[in-house]
Amino acid sequence: MFLAYRMADSNHFALMGLPRSFSLDPGTLEAAWRRLQAAVHPDRHVQGSGTERRIAMEMATRVNEAYRVLRDPLRRAAYLCELDGVDVRSESNTAMPAEFLMQQMTWRETLEDARAGRDQAALGALAGEVDSARHELLARIRTLLDGQRASQAAADAVRQLMFLERIGEEIDLADDF
């Protein structure tokens, strides 16, 4: 199996043959995934030995996991930080800027008020505001990871992005009432 050497110690970027960067072209990522899946998919190895079939399954699983991580900006940013030795999900590091904490409280109150009042317009406005903040934060993360190589600062921004993703999901759920 020609990819076995890439599987053992490589990170997701190396496995996919892509540069280690937050800024990835989605089309290039998908093309790399399709190319690798075509080579390692277990259906291509049904005539192989049990060991070869098991290795093909492991490789396909690893390629799929790499694709899932790299296609999601939040997971990709967290992964890049972790490659640099910075634990994004560290329970001991939950500090956030006071301004962001205040904004969180405001968004939570707005969400609860809109939910209680079944106010679709307020939910829509909140969704737009959170989405705008998310895009700004993604641009900041891009600068921190690709431009400045500041993984610790990027990890702090990733934790903020995690909150934005959660509240975005809650807004979507509230919008379904």
Label each region the model flagged:
Residues M1-F177:
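C-terminal accessory/regulatory regions appended to core domains
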